[in-house]
């Protein structure tokens, strides 16, 4: 869901986070020197990032490990204070108005949980509803709707520690939305999930963005998440914002080839021009769905060469 001209739900200006870490020297003398002198160096996790996210946007925030994605999310949500720069969420500073901002945002970290480990899942929901002062009628409506959309009914009475990764992630997403936030931050919500669990999470996120107008910022290493969910992509590397635009522009700027000629050590029988090569993406109602990655444009069995033409958009997904 993209709203042209909508007010900014999230604003970052010159956002910078610098960590000061100790410098370790080898040997006994190095340890003594570190103990006495306390030598340090600065590590720039995020180095001057600026962007706006409009209300109702679904934005992907991608980059390699250590690029600064999670640090950015933590500053946007008030978990970390920026070294310098400004952050606003719905016009409020997460650092100065923590309670007000907390009422308006939901946060999910794929490798952590806000659920109580030894309690049944339903108890965690009830505790969170009380913490956010959710009215009983709103809570019942939430439970009815989200139990159906996320399939929570099968494990509501199960302790969180006994949930599968897919079940826990669905429960964590529901918990982040229990107080009807206007902005949702998702840090790798599909990490470690199987194909079916990922599809269920993606479908749910699409619905709440489309039907409720929830603004979503998603970090992920799965390009399928970006392709299916996000109209806009931001790329961060070494703490710097390297790209901000749509997926098609990102693929074009990456310089992916559109054609390729291969010389093979041996030729498989049956290769013909016009044949498409692809992969199975999942099981649909009518059978297996397949996404073509490339088309054979020429075959020469004498020279043992095959020419391929790629679909750049589909070839970009893992």
Predicted features and spans:
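Catalytic Walker B motif of ABC-type/P-loop ATPase nucleotide-binding domains
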Residues: 184-188
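Conserved ABC ATPase "signature" region
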Residues: 27-35, 126, 130, 137-155
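Conserved catalytic motifs of ABC-family nucleotide-binding domains
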Residues: 180
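ABC transporter nucleotide-binding domain
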Residues: 202-282, 286-311
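Conserved ABC transporter NBD signature motif
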Residues: 85-93, 101-102
């Amino acid at each position: 869901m993209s709203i042209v001209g909508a007010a900014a739900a999230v604003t970052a200006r010159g956002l910078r986070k610098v960590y000061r870490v100790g410098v370790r020297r080898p040997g006994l003398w190095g340890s003594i020197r570190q103990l006495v002198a306390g030598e340090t160096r600065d590590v720039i996790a995020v180095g001057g990032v600026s962007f706006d996210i409009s209300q109702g946007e679904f934005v992907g925030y991608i980059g390699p490990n250590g690029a600064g994605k999670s640090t950015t999310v933590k500053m946007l949500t008030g978990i970390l204070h920026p070294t310098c720069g400004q952050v606003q969420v719905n016009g409020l500073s997460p650092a100065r108005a923590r309670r007000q901002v907390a009422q308006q945002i939901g946060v999910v970290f794929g490798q952590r949980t806000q659920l109580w480990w030894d309690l049944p899942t339903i108890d965690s929901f009830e505790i969170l509803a009380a913490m956010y002062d959710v009215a009983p009628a709103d809570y019942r409506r939430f439970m009815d709707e989200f139990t159906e959309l996320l399939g929570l009914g099968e494990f509501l009475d199960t302790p969180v520690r006994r949930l599968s990764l897919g079940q826990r992630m669905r429960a964590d997403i529901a918990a982040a939305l229990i107080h009807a936030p206007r902005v949702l931050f998702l840090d790798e919500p599909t990490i470690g999930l199987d194909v079916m669990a990922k599809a269920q999470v993606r479908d749910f996120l699409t619905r709440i963005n489309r039907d409720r107008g929830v603004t979503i910022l998603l970090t992920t290493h799965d390009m399928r998440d970006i392709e299916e969910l996000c109209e806009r992509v931001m790329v961060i590397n070494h703490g710097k914002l390297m790209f901000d635009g749509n997926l098609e522009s990102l693929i074009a700027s990456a310089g992916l080839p559109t054609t390729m000629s291969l010389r093979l050590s041996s030729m498989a029988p049956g290769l013909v021009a016009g044949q498409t090569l692809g992969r199975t993406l999942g099981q649909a109602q009518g059978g297996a769905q397949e996404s073509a990655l490339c088309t054979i444009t020429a075959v020469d069995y004498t020279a043992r060469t095959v020419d391929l033409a790629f679909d750049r958009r589909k070839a970009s997904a893992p």
